[in-house]
Structure formats: structure tokens, C-alpha cells
Amino acid sequence: MVHTTSPLLLLLLLSLALVAPSLSARKCSLTGKWTNNLGSIMTIRAVNSRGEFAGTYLTAVADNPGNIKLSPLLGIQHKRACQPTFGFTVHWNFSESTSVFVGQCFIDRSGKEVLKTKWLQRLAVDDISDDWKATRVGYNNFTRQRTVEE
């Protein structure tokens, strides 16, 4: 007995066999230069074997924009996942505040890397009675800045 297979089914199976490995093999990488939805620029240097990384953050927004300075960041990510979760802290060099970000590195449907983050910013206050207003919460979405060669 001979079975015939439709050409459409063969084409579909061949397409899946060729496309599926490339989708799963692509890994989202934190290393590089990123811009968020507000225009801030973040640079993450190489992630080490333990998932630790360092970099810089230049915010585009601040209570006193004239004082903005490049600020250091330190973080860690999970290394095994293709779309890893991560967290980092920014020590602001121009104000008495610290921010922590948590997020995940995604590859969107068009193949672009996107960092989806939530953050807390702790401001210094002079009195414990002002504690209620010392923590801000927000989100940022970062996209990779492409180099000239890309």
C-alpha cells in the first residue's frame, strides 16, 4: 500500500524543520548599548560566567535635569535561559537616590531584542515622617542601539 503526502504538508513540515531551530537558538544578550522609552541610555559591558555585569546609565529625566551625570550600574542575570531575567542597581552620581531595576530580555516577533523592566527609586529624605514619599515606582522598555556596521 502506497501513501501519498500532499505537497502542502511537505512544505509545511520542511518550513518548520528549517525555522524552528533558528528561533530557539537565538539568545537575548544584555551586553551592549540600550535606549529606553524616555530617551535614557544604558550601556552594559560583558556579562561574566556567573551572570554578573557592570555598566553605565545616563538618564534623560530627573527632578533637576541640569545636574544629570553618567552613573554606574551593577547587576546579575540568569545565564541559562534564551530570554533571561535580570536585575541591576543604579547609584545616581547626581542625587541622593538609588534605583533598582528587574526585568527580562526578550526577542520580539520581528527578531529585535527588548528589555522589559520595572523599577523602584529610593530618594533620601531628612525625616522618617517623609518616608511615605521617598519611593517611586515605574517601568521602562529598552531597545538595543544598533552600531554602524549593523
Curated annotation (Swiss-Prot):
Signal peptide interval: 1-24
Disulfide bonds: C28-C105
Pfam families in alphabetical order: Avidin (PF01382)
Keywords: Biotin, Disulfide bond, Glycoprotein, Secreted, Signal
Glycan attachment sites: N93, N141
Top-level lineage group: Eukaryota
InterPro entries: Avidin (IPR005469), Avidin-like_CS (IPR017889), Avidin-like_sf (IPR036896), Avidin/str (IPR005468), Avidin/Streptavidin-rel (IPR051764)
Domain Avidin-like: 26-147
Binding site for biotin: N36, S40, Y57, T59, D63, S95, S99, N140
Mod. after translation: Glycosylated.
GO MF annotations in UniProt: biotin binding
Localization annotation: Secreted
SUPFAM superfamilies: Avidin/streptavidin
GO CC terms: extracellular region
Family per similarity comment: Belongs to the avidin/streptavidin family.
Subunit structure: Homotetramer.
Function: Forms a strong non-covalent specific complex with biotin.
Name of this protein: Avidin-related protein 3
